[in-house]
């Protein structure tokens, strides 16, 4: 088990943890370096990030951000079963049933610094007990990946059953079809 975190909006992490979302989009943070973003880690903890504007950028009826304190609750672990770059806005938009982002957010990410976006299909696991990390300066900044300390002992269980997961993966494969560029 890698001890790395993928920084994602808190509301998206929650949707992944409830089984309401099964993919993540990423263009890359400012601090991604010369090579830009890639899903270089195929297994990672979901590291929630907090900013109030995310409430208006998701398609859920009632979105409340938890209070931001000194601790960060790590509640989910993910395995990227598919990771690719999509160069077709039509395909990126067609993935709407698999995520909670507003359509304009997908278009914005797709068009930022050139067309195309990275997407990963995930198998998400709830970890028990939740892992509480103290918020540290090293976790800040516009980058996707953060190194975490060694995780404590924990149990993991998939957030969706195997049959549902297989259906979601088949839908992802159908929607992306031959428009794939594997993410290295």
Regions found by a protein language model. Give the residues of each.
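Structured alpha/beta reader/binder surfaces that contact nucleic acids or chromatin modification marks
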Residues: 2-184
């Amino acid at each position: 088990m890698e001890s790395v975190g993928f920084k994602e909006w808190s509301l998206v992490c929650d949707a992944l943890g409830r089984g309401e979302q099964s993919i993540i989009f990423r263009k890359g943070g400012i601090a991604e370096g010369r090579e830009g973003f890639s899903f270089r880690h195929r297994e990672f903890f979901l590291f929630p990030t907090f900013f109030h504007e995310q409430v208006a950028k998701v398609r859920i009826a009632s979105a409340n951000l938890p209070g931001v304190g000194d601790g960060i609750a790590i509640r989910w672990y993910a395995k990227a079963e598919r990771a690719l770059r999509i160069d077709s806005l039509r395909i990126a938009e067609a993935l709407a049933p698999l995520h909670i982002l507003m359509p304009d957010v997908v278009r914005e990410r797709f068009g930022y610094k050139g067309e195309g976006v990275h997407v990963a299909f995930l198998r998400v696991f709830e970890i028990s007990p939740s892992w509480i990390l103290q918020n540290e300066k090293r976790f800040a900044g516009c980058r996707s990946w953060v190194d975490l300390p060694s995780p404590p002992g924990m149990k993991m269980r998939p957030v969706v059953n195997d049959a549902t997961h297989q259906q979601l993966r088949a839908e992802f494969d159908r929607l992306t079809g031959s428009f794939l560029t594997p993410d290295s």
